[in-house]
Design a protein with these regions (language model features):
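Glycine-aromatic-enriched surface loops/turns that form tight recognition elements
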Residues: 2-6, 10-122, 126-205
Length: 205
């Protein structure tokens, strides 16, 4: 009996040591980085919904969440690059919406809506946009944490970085703006007139 008890104690001790030296890692380390936010700006637990924005706790940036609801946040809508002065207005494609779309229009309408309680939304910089890239995502999917950004498309997303010289076929158009391709995480420069996707950002605090 004493021998069996000693073996049991030794086994338990070994398991405790193993657990200490090799702690179980979360299934998705990315999940602790993101915080779901409601339309009114209230945080949600990871399993709750619906959510309209996502807070990146590493950078302090708050991101728009794209939808399939045929409104201004619809993931299929595309935009030409325009900031009110530079660029080309109204060359995007906004389904089921009168007129065409550009990035300035999307920023203006999102701020008027006070998405997630904020009215200082803007187009992200290239560096900010690349913080969303998750290269561990399986091939064939958009390179982003889809559990928090389920509607981001495999395609080009505009940044705010502009006046960048174009090369090759587009060189005759002069300059354009940077975009990040969520198929592979690569940065490219596109003509302002091109229709690309858009995800807006603001600073949480």
């Amino acid at each position: 009996m004493i021998k069996r008890l000693s073996i049991l104690v030794a086994l338990i001790t070994s398991l405790v040591v193993i657990a200490y030296l090799h702690p179980i890692q979360p299934d998705n380390p990315q999940s602790s980085r993101w915080q779901k936010i409601t339309m009114s700006g209230q945080p949600l637990d990871i399993w709750q919904g619906p959510w309209n924005c996502v807070l990146d706790k590493q950078t302090g940036l708050l991101w728009e969440v794209k939808t399939d609801s045929e409104n201004i946040h619809d993931s299929y809508w595309s935009y030409s690059w325009f900031d009110g002065e530079r660029g080309v207005p109204d060359r995007g494609d906004c389904f089921f919406n009168e007129g065409r779309c550009d990035s300035f229009d999307h920023v203006t309408r999102t701020n008027a809506e006070s998405l997630c309680g904020r009215n200082d939304w803007r187009v992200p910089t290239t560096d900010e946009l690349t913080t969303l890239i998750n290269l561990s995502v399986p091939n064939g999917q958009a390179k982003i944490s889809s559990g928090f950004f389920p509607r981001v498309r495999k395609g080009d997303y505009w940044s705010s970085d502009h006046s960048i010289p174009l090369h090759g076929f587009y060189a005759r158009l002069g300059d354009g703006a940077n975009a990040v391709d969520f198929r592979d995480g690569q940065v490219k420069t596109l003509p302002y007139r091109n229709a690309a996707f858009l995800i807006l950002v603001t600073q949480w605090e």
